[in-house]
Amino acid sequence: KSSFKETEFMKIKKYIKRMEKNNETLRVLRHSCSHIMAQAVQKLFPQAKLAIGPAVENGFYYDFDLTDGHAFTEEDLTKIEEEMKNIIKQNLTFEKYVIPDVEKQIAEFKAEGEIYKAELLEEHKNDNPTLYLTKDKDGNVLFNDLCAGPHIPNTSYIKGNAIKLLKVAGAYWRGNEKNKMLQRIYATA
């Protein structure tokens, strides 16, 4: 027969496990939102080049290089957020894709001007790198991003009003002041 202390300990242990699972679920959802933000930004600002977009403790961010020198404004953030909501409503799926020919993918990124993605892929080419594809209901790829994942199965897991773009800040590529200053959009979900 277990003692009261052991029973309480087990309850606490189960609670901690459940909270860790909830935190991981939230991290995956936020990371998926960062991809949706990148997709929205590239639709509205085709000159935008993608750097990185992880989930962080209180939300997520994505770093962009607007090659025409445009600086994101509050009005831009409103438009990006609205486009994100439109993307979410489409019930798009996220699909993991193992890159079969890494050198070819690096060349494609370079041809598209996606120098940051090319640099990251070059660095991780021996790690079985993957893209995450965002697809519509007919299987058409609408967006792809270099990413290890994981992601939510589809955008219906996100409530459109549960995302909020917060601010723009400068961020040096890879945190190195000798590198180019990018624009980081912070958000939460």
Each language-model region and where it sits:
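Active/ligand-binding-proximal structured segments within catalytic/core domains
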Residues: 27-45
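Structural signature of FAD isoalloxazine-binding scaffolds in flavoprotein oxidoreductases
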Residues: 54-56
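Generic serine detector
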Residues: 2-3, 32-34, 156
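Auxiliary tRNA-acceptor-end handling modules of aminoacyl-tRNA synthetases
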Residues: 11-28, 49-52, 61-189
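N-terminal amphipathic/basic-hydrophobic helices that include classical n-h-c signal peptides
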Residues: 1-15
